[in-house]
Amino acid sequence: MSGDKPAQPRLVVTLDGPSGSGKSTLARQLARELGWHYVDSGAWYRAVIWAVLESGALTADEAKALELLSQNSFRCQPDGLIAFHGKVLGPEIRSAEIDTAVSDLADLAEVRTAINKTIQKQLQAPQVEGVVADGRDAGSVIFPHAQLKVYVDVPLETRARRRHQQNLDSDIASDHATILQSLTDR
């Protein structure tokens, strides 16, 4: 491979767009239809902050996050879930506590770099034919040479309604007006 093109799976599609636009739903469905790996980069940040908080830290502890990532404790699952020390993480990374802490972690440049490199490394395996990825840095940093990059956008009110319903479906307390304001503030 050329020096400026990082190793990546043979075929990559990335979806980007604002929170609540439906990009994760579309990416997950597309990956399932194609039989490819699905990567939800947002789930990575959630998994890392969950592990940091589980370790006893009270905030987005950069040193602890980097330590956990350097230990190869996290693994991509083909369906987009993340395993930590073999335990597949699900609803525990979608809690209000994680929602509050995850943006602080995502603001840490070294942690973002470490997460992105971990995803790239794990998906370079020859058996990974294709990847559909969405979320932070998917098309710009993780897979900059993706064969197809899609931007998904929908009106703000639709995004708020989708996120509110998603929370309710996951048994997470939710207030439509609060979500609408949060999305507006982003």
Language-model features: locations:
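Active-site signature of alpha/beta-hydrolase-fold catalytic machinery across serine-
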Residues: Q29
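Hydrophobic positions on the alpha1 helix immediately C-terminal to the Walker A/P-loop
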Residues: L26
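Short, well-ordered beta-strand core segments
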Residues: V131, Q147-Y151
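Conserved lysine of the Walker
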Residues: K23
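P-loop (Walker A) phosphate-binding loop of NTP-binding proteins
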Residues: P18
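ATP-dependent small-molecule kinase phosphotransfer cores
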Residues: A43-E129, E157-R161, Q165, D169, ...
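Phosphate-binding P-loop
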Residues: D4-R10
